[in-house]
């Protein structure tokens, strides 16, 4: 299933116009700029001042546009991205709480949300120190997964909103432990 994610408000009318042209009801996602910022080397790629994503106000405006077209059920995914290699689990927890509250409010306003994309950020403990420095993380994969589920579930339960299907973009954590060294053979012996 392909879900186009709106990262700039000007993309929404393009998606809606094209969907109308080809006669489909699109499944749409929106990337929210959270107030929470990531940590570590790539922290500027997330947060409210990020060049990617929509403010909460823009998302609400987008939902109103969808409602005007009778398409609020088409908004099915909320996405956020803190950055890459988030070293401190507290940052992740804060962002999860904020994003979950946006998810709940959009659901209450009539969005057909089913998915929460928690983006990237799952870090790798490169130096083995288990600290919140750039080359490490102060959490395990299991702790990260538990926190994602717990925080989304708790906020949704408090608001009596169905739990979302969780999507993650944890590319670094998937590939970091697998590497390959490629080089030219300079000579052969024997």
Task: Report each predicted region and the residues it spans.
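Active-site-proximal beta-alpha core segment in soluble small-molecule metabolic enzymes
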Residues: 1-117, 124, 140-143
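C-terminal active-site-proximal or functional interface alpha/beta core segments in diverse enzymes
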Residues: 84-190
